[in-house]
Amino acid sequence: MQAFTQLNGLVAPLDRANVDTDAIIPKQFLKSIKRAGFGPNAFDEWRYLDQGEPGKDNSKRPLNPDFPLNFPRYQGASILLTRENFGCGSSREHAPWALLDYGFRAIIAPSFADIFFNNCFKNGILPIVLDAEIVDSLFKEVEANEGYHLLVDLQSQIVQTPGGRHYAFEIDPFRKHCLLNGLDDIGLTLQHVDEIKAFEARHKAAQPWLFNES
């Protein structure tokens, strides 16, 4: 997993509340368990004018000109600004996979669905909770200023605007450690590989009949 320390990123606004995981990545794309390749189908039903299907050439599909993420000014955005209860619905981990593959490393909202919130950390995305009033002001600034960037500093737990305002956010210390060091569940396990091997050796010596290799 790629470490997250500091991000100076273009912000894209998605001014919708209660965006569920089926909107983030529709159910027909859930057959694959590979983490990569979902980006072109993120927000598929809002992003395109036709019905998306696995294996379809997205480069030839008609784009929805009214969907903000299709606006030229937001191409290359790495920070998503959205409304409350983002990521509600089913617990599919494909949702953060799709957002990460699209290019988002941070999501700012007044609140998130719990399972989606946890899945973001496991996949290298930083979900940031800010007060609704702050999110309102950020929406106004993003829409009024083309090329609007925010600086996200995880170590300091600060979001900084181009005008120099700072907004502090909370994060669990363990999750912060994992993001700063690029540790997913596998990475965390590998940190203890010596202890695991030692335990297995002791276990085999104490109960050899469980390890009959004949």
From Swiss-Prot:
GO biological process terms on file: L-leucine biosynthetic process
Keyword Signal attributed: no
Enzyme class: lyase
EC number: 4.2.1.33
InterPro entries: 3-IsopropMal_deHydase_ssu (IPR004431), Aconitase/3IPM_dehydase_swvl (IPR015928), AconitaseA/IPMdHydase_ssu_swvl (IPR000573), IPMI_Swivel (IPR033940), LeuD (IPR050075)
Catalytic activity: (2R,3S)-3-isopropylmalate = (2S)-2-isopropylmalate
Pfam families: Aconitase_C (PF00694)
GO molecular function: 3-isopropylmalate dehydratase activity
SUPFAM superfamilies: LeuD/IlvD-like (SSF52016)
A GO term from the CC aspect: 3-isopropylmalate dehydratase complex
Pathway terms, separated by semicolons: Amino-acid biosynthesis; L-leucine biosynthesis; L-leucine from 3-methyl-2-oxobutanoate: step 2/4
Keywords from the UniProt entry: Amino-acid biosynthesis, Branched-chain amino acid biosynthesis, Leucine biosynthesis, Lyase
Family affiliation: Belongs to the LeuD family. LeuD type 1 subfamily.
Function: Catalyzes the isomerization between 2-isopropylmalate and 3-isopropylmalate, via the formation of 2-isopropylmaleate.
Record note on quaternary structure: Heterodimer of LeuC and LeuD.
Name assigned to this protein: 3-isopropylmalate dehydratase small subunit
Native organism: Methylobacillus flagellatus (strain ATCC 51484 / DSM 6875 / VKM B-1610 / KT)
Gene: leuD
